[in-house]
Amino acid sequence: MQLTVTNDVNGEVYGPLELSGDMMLMDLVALLEVDCAFESGKQQLYFNGKELKPDVEKTLEELGIGNDDLIVIRGQPVSSNSIANSTSAIELDDDAYVEQFRLQLLSNSALRNSLRMPFADIDSLVNDPQQFKTHMGPVIIQRRRMQSAMPTNPYGIPDEEYKKLMTNPEDPEHKKRLQELQDKQLIDEQLRNALEYTPEVFAQVSMLYINMEINGHPVKAFVDSGAQMTIISPRLAEKTELKRFIDNRFIGEARGVGTGKILGRVHQVQVKIETQFIPCSFVVLDSNVDLLLGLDMLKRHQACIDLEKNVLRIAGTETKFLGEAEIPKGTSFDAVGNPQPPVEIKESADHSKKKMKTSFTITPKVKPVKADNLLNNSSPMGNTGRTFPEKTIKQLMDLGFSRQEVIQALVSTNGNAEFAASLLFQ
């Protein structure tokens, strides 16, 4: 059978080790001490969450250990007995340590067989102390040096720091440090589990793009329900013959993760998705994303992003999301793989002497008012006879609307200037 051994103390993974099912557990422990930096007095073995006692006289099969299973080495609190045992082991010089290991191999055929692959002549070596010391001594001594240099505490930190922490574990600073170490162990365990059971979460996810047409020009549109507005870049507006329809009165600044310059707005254009023509409006933003289909158009046409079928349903039609190979290259994304759409849009009119910045981060829930009603209403106060601050009326008029339109919008929104501005721009 093949076993994999992970050592939580030094963070190493060993294996797969080729072993026999009738191998005794104590023989496995001896092998792990040589090959996997396991110290029986200071560390513990775990299989399926249960501790394996090294002194149990059972075979691996009897313990339920099978092919491709995992053995975990974990540290344990240092006791006075273990310190005494480790001290006596360190007192052995290198030659005595090598000879002790040779004698152990002589009396343990299973352990000797496990070393047959790296040392084909292991039988002759163990019977000749001098040859064993010459050929295997350097390897055994190197392993011993590595084990002695490794931290012996369960957190894998320098032993001096561990002893300092454990002298007064209730000290607030010590308690904070111990909690950090425990959290790190938990994070490392979660990472190992994620790599083993859900490795797909570490793969890059393709963003959602669809094919559409603007004035007969094929375009790949990025679908982003997290973006507030639908955006088109100046170069794509020029390519699709929309540049002459850009309303320059709506220049401003878009603020999100970064900032972008708004060059204007295209109020209405017919875009084609599959066989369906859909009215759409664009904010012209100097961005690396040529076309971004934002929440305004998705909500307007009652779109549904169906990830199970990998399609976008919008305005009675259905179109497939593009595969990774079809997605435009060179699009700007942030560190977590998301684009940087504007979150707040501030618009102003060029001809105004005093620009009013209007935030569209809140969508007003007001009853739509027909343009005919706005234009034909002769009463400057509306039907309610309410009056509004002259300063508010002037600010909204500076955006390019008549006094009657402004007052009617304020009446419809109960005097809320931001909602009134949003209503006027519809």
Curated annotation (Swiss-Prot):
Its EC number is 3.4.23.-. PROSITE patterns: UBA, UBIQUITIN_2. Gene3D superfamilies: Acid Proteases, DNA helicase RuvA subunit, C-terminal domain, Phosphatidylinositol 3-kinase Catalytic Subunit, Chain A, domain 1. GO terms for molecular function: aspartic-type endopeptidase activity; polyubiquitin modification-dependent protein binding; proteasome regulatory particle binding; protein-macromolecule adaptor activity; SNARE binding; ubiquitin binding. Residues 1-80 form the Ubiquitin-like domain. The keyword Disulfide bond does not apply. It holds the Pfam family Asp_protease. Residues 387-426 form the UBA domain. Keywords: Aspartyl protease, Cytoplasm, Hydrolase, Protease, Protein transport, Transport. The active site is at 224. It is found in: Cytoplasm. InterPro entries: DDI1_N, Peptidase_A2_cat, Peptidase_aspartic_DDI1-type, Peptidase_aspartic_dom_sf, UBA, UBA-like_sf, Ubiquitin-like_dom, Ubiquitin-like_domsf. Probable aspartic protease. May be involved in the regulation of exocytosis. Acts as a linker between the 19S proteasome and polyubiquitinated proteins via UBA domain interactions with ubiquitin for their subsequent degradation. Required for S-phase checkpoint control. Belongs to the DDI1 family. This is DNA damage-inducible protein 1.
